[in-house]
Amino acid sequence: MAKGLLVCLFIGLVAADTDAPFNILGQTGYSGEITVNITTKSSLFYWLFQSLTGDIETDTRPLLIWLPGGSGGSISVDLLAERISPLYIDELGNPHFNNMTWALRMHIMGVDFPYGVGYSSPTFWSDWIVDIPTGAQVFITFLNKLQMKYPAWFKREIYIGGQDLAGLFIPAIASLIHKNNGNLTPGQLGYLNLKGLILGDTWVNALQIVNTYDTFAYNQGLANLEQRNVMTTYENYVLGNATSNPHLAFVALQNLLAYVDTIAGPLNFINYRLYNDDNIGNLAAFLNNPVYKLELNVPRAVTWSQVTQSVSTNLTTLYFISQAAVLSTVLNNYKVMIFSSQDNFLINPIAVQQEISNLNWEGISDFESARRSAYTVSGNIVGYVQASSNLTFVQILNTGLIVGLTQALNPRDMIYRFVFNQGWN
């Protein structure tokens, strides 16, 4: 009975598209819920920030579609805390203009994906995303519905990006776009002019990530030799159960991280040099403010949360499903930039480079022999870059996962160099 009442409640919250233009501090775009499943009325929330001096209805500037990272996390954290959008939020929940926004030269769309994240609403239990192919299809359906409503938005180059666990879905989404495009012609409804992917601190192949924690902790002085050996034991247990019993492997992974937190913490796993959480502003106060919810075309009864635990739980079995083969195939047809944050423990630089080295891509040998160069912004070395054919890898120095919070200019410069083919030297 309680489950039936919950289903009725969800249906009552969002039953039709709510999206429309918004204007906050003079920053304009479109936002709201798009009903993806016409039978159950499950919906995804998006907000699209127009390029600061552009008009998405008339120009041809690129569109960057960004997916949330983290397990059950909202896209609003990426857009607002990482300084991707033209807005950021202070500790009182007030919005301010961000002059380092990526929207200076491109349009930015963020999506609360999958269902249940942020403002997005599932209406039936059957709509919860529990596998990657279904998630990719739901996202493509969402894009196709937007394309039907706003065809001009998609008459341009499209890039899809995200960090962390977004790496589980983005290669599958790109692969499905490529497959669908094969049956269509450019300009035809459903054809998406995908040009490239951007993957930050990406969780593509868990087996190449988990087995680095002992080495990374030891090399960074977070563990001594004895503690490193304990971590190795934990890792072997995780990896030994990853395929046969992913639930058990996930529990073991949590125990491994808890052990690291005990010996080296309390540790900020996405920026190990900080011993407290990143200050991302009071997003909940802003996003649950009735005035701003109304402006963003969010149904009044919908409540925003930074992380949705039920979504996180549903995704646990996906952690150990490698997307390396899918990404390898995508690389044959699209350019891909992978970047790594130096101080992210959870998906550390060793892990990201192992993920790359283990790609079964035809160009991997040429990439690994390509020159690695210093990456400079305004004359300062901010990282290193290595590129060959369709693959670019950027190592960003002195930052954790939320790069834009501490280095707002550098990630924008990196994105622009990749999208606009500006070169690195």
Language-model features: where?
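Terminal and linker regions of secretory-pathway proteins
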Residues: 2-425
